Amino acid sequence: MKKIFVFLAISLISLKLFAQVSQVRVGLLNGPTCVPAAYLMENKKSISADGTDAELTYEKFADPQALLPKMIKKEIDIGFMPANVAAKVYNAGNKSIICCAVVGLGNLSLITTDENIRRFTDLKGKTVYVAGQGATPEYMFRYLLKENKMTWSGEKADITMDFSIPTAQIAAQLISGKIQYAVVPEPFATIAKTKSDKVITALDFQKEYLELTGEKEVYPLSVMVVRADFAKDNPKLMEALLADYDAAVNWTNNNAAEAGALCEKHSLGLAAGVVTKAIPVSNYTFVPAASAKKSIEKLLKLFLEGDKTSIGGKLPDKGFYYK
């Protein structure tokens, strides 16, 4: 009888190990965040860990709000989203989703057709259309305005922030002359400037941030996340996957034209030409979460100052950062 129990125990352990590495389900965001993933979609159908191959599957989502329910229901293992969204989910729930790497640094700018804008104070009395209410563009803009002693709320506000135009439509509205000032991430600044030589980058948020903070590297914009239980059960698989994504980022940064073509081929929501032109200024990177903790927390503190609910009321604890 004892031998039977031992045999069953070994069998169950073997089945569990097999299940752990049979498939890795990756959730991608359409648009600029996951451009480096196009390389993996083209070249990585599986991933090896401890001599066993796990199939890589990819599912695309319009935004983090569409992706998150599937991660929470354990239908997706790996995902991508803004750092504040990941922190909010971690703080609000049972810490089921953690950050494993920063994959994109800041690439925000104020674009305009007004050549007279040279500094933030030149925006006084203007209406600025901002991409992404409650996201990094809004809170980074708030921070930079505050540091330049500018206000954006109240009856005597120096500027008006408007969030009424979807991000993908801002470039067209600017080119048509319906609006004149906008805060956008890449590749939307590149799209606008490519289609009209009247559109210029007036304010580089990264440059301003570095000058104000004394930091050596700009703020994180997007992160890769993983289900905490998946990461715990599959450390070797995670190690291999993170190494592969790191390589994909390096390849993308060094092969802009080819990366643009792959992005269009795999229907990630952007035309090849746009991606190719935007990659040099998109700040794709790969920084393991443990190494990026300081920069992530610095960014999240800006969210806390602006709206505590934007990250779940507090900075996430050390368990948020995958090691």
Model-derived segments and their meaning:
Residues 231-306:
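Secondary-structure end/capping motifs
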Residues 31, 61-65, 80, 131-139, ...:
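Soluble non-cytosolic domains of exported or imported proteins
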Residues 297-323:
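Conserved C-terminal helix/tail region of periplasmic/extracytoplasmic solute-binding proteins
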Residues 15-19:
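Sec/Tat signal peptide C-region and signal peptidase I cleavage site
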Residues 83-85, 166-262:
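Pocket-lining segment of extracytoplasmic ligand-binding domains
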Residues 4-13:
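Sec-dependent N-terminal signal peptides
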Residues 45-53, 208-214, 284-293:
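Short, solvent-exposed loop/beta-turn-alpha elements that line the ligand-binding surface or hinge
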Residues 22-162, 180, 186, 202:
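Short, glycine-/small- and polar/acidic-enriched structural segments
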